[in-house]
Each structure stands twice: as C-alpha cells, then as structure tokens.
Design a protein with these regions (language model features):
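Exposed, low-complexity/repetitive linear segments and helix-based recognition motifs
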Residues: 6-8, 30, 58
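Recognition helix of helix-turn-helix DNA-binding domains
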Residues: 19-54, 61
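Regulatory hinge/linker segments at domain boundaries
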Residues: 1-15
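…primarily DNA-binding HTH/wHTH and HhH modules…
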Residues: 65-66
Length: 66
C-alpha cells in the first residue's frame, strides 16, 4: 500500500476494528503482546493517529479496511 502498511499490520488493524485487545490479537496471531504493540505503534505513525479508535476511523475513511 501507498502508506507502507505491511500485510501483518493490516491484519492487526482489522482485529483492532473487531474490538480485540492487544492480548487477544497476540493469541490469535500466535505472537507476543510486545510484537502487537510494535505493530500498533507503527500503524499509529503511518496513519498519523494517537489512539486505536482514531486508527480504525482513519483506516475506514481511507478505505484501508471495511
């Protein structure tokens, strides 16, 4: 994507939009919670947001997720 969002970051973003916690996302993707926090941090920079809800709203506005 033009924003440089990786496939894994997109997967994390979709799970955030479904209301999953960092721990739940980590368990779903079989990675550590620390890894998820890193992906979320990267997403915040790429989407220019500060909160999870803002990330989901921005991603929907930009048609990154449905």
């Amino acid at each position: 994507q033009a924003l440089g969002i990786s496939p894994r970051e997109l997967e994390v973003l979709q799970l955030i939009s479904q209301g999953l916690s960092n721990n739940e996302i980590a368990e779903t993707l079989f990675v550590s919670e620390s890894t998820i926090k890193t992906h979320i941090s990267n997403l915040f920079v790429k989407l220019d947001v500060k909160r999870r809800t803002q990330a989901v709203i921005r991603a929907k506005e930009w048609c990154i997720i449905a």
